[in-house]
Amino acid sequence: MKHLLSISDLSKDEIVGLLDEADRFKEVLEGREVKKLPTLRGRTIFTLFYENSTRTRSSFETAGKWMSADVINISASSSSVKKGESLKDTGLTLSAIGADAIIMRHPASGAAQQLAQFVAPGGNGPSVINAGDGSHQHPTQALLDALTIRQRTGRIEGLKVVIVGDCLHSRVVRSNVDLLSTLGAEVVLVAPPTLLPMGVENWPVRFSYDMDAEIADADVVMMLRVQQERMQGGFFPSHREYATLYGMSKEREARLKDSAIIMHPGPMLRGMEINFQVADAPRTAVLQQVSNGVHMRMAILFALVAGSDATI
């Protein structure tokens, strides 16, 4: 595996292998006072973010540093991108400096694929990891979500996973649908008609407008943020009406199965798609998702950058 651009790049066995590797990293680091491994010593990793990020960027940086890599962060707002430099020239510059991997977030769908073609023609050059490209894909988020589900429930196959919210603009939902359906989960999308993607009837999912009907027997309920920064025009009448119909209230949380878990890829809008108290409830796995993000991204960097003879 040279790059990680989309969940569709991975076979079922490769997905399971990455989940297992992430669990191994967690086990190795657990209880260590100094969380440091020599696995990527001498490797150089660039994070190149054209959009804001807290969880993804900081967890990739932490993952790289815990593996002893040199991690260099570049923000588009403070680089030559601000002067008009193209994605191609930015990528080639980082490659010439000596990048072993470039982790990129970009507002344009397909940008990660383009970068990989620019910097690694014929497979020679740095690995590219897609940290989110427009509304297209966010493969590392889907992998850490699957890791969290597996840790909480013991399996993924046969589970009913209900994803609620802005499915239209979400790259997370696209990656999760691909991954969870590959691993044998039943995936249901719940949203108002205006926030479901065109062609969703051709996806390997069911879709519904009725949150209460679908979450009653759900094993996992994943809430999504309304991405107002990607919206032009009105997609729902008001925030209050949206929260009433599609928010995870205390009443809805109380009606879930005892074993059901609640997830959210973040950032959360407390009081809109999730109640303030529910966000901190024991069944809510948000902070476990964040913690797993580091171990999952360590596994990804290990697979792409460490080399075939490397050991943890």
Curated annotation (Swiss-Prot):
Residues involved in carbamoyl phosphate binding: 55-56, 105, 138, 141, 266-267
Keyword annotations: Pyrimidine biosynthesis, Transferase
BP term (GO), one: 'de novo' UMP biosynthetic process
Membrane-spanning intervals of the chain: none
Gene Ontology CC terms: cytosol
Signal peptide: none
Binding-site list for L-aspartate: 83, 171, 225
The enzyme's E.C. designation: 2.1.3.2
One Gene Ontology MF term: aspartate carbamoyltransferase activity
Pfam family, one: OTCace
The reaction(s) this protein catalyses: carbamoyl phosphate + L-aspartate = N-carbamoyl-L-aspartate + phosphate + H(+)
Biological or metabolic pathway of the protein: Pyrimidine metabolism; UMP biosynthesis via de novo pathway; (S)-dihydroorotate from bicarbonate: step 2/3
PANTHER family, per database record: ASPARTATE CARBAMOYLTRANSFERASE, ORNITHINE CARBAMOYLTRANSFERASE, MITOCHONDRIAL
Described function: Catalyzes the condensation of carbamoyl phosphate and aspartate to form carbamoyl aspartate and inorganic phosphate, the committed step in the de novo pyrimidine nucleotide biosynthesis pathway.
Similarity remark: Belongs to the aspartate/ornithine carbamoyltransferase superfamily. ATCase family.
Assembly and binders: Heterododecamer (2C3:3R2) of six catalytic PyrB chains organized as two trimers (C3), and six regulatory PyrI chains organized as three dimers (R2).
Protein's name in the database: Aspartate carbamoyltransferase catalytic subunit
Species for this entry: Corynebacterium glutamicum (strain R)
Gene transcribed to yield this protein: pyrB
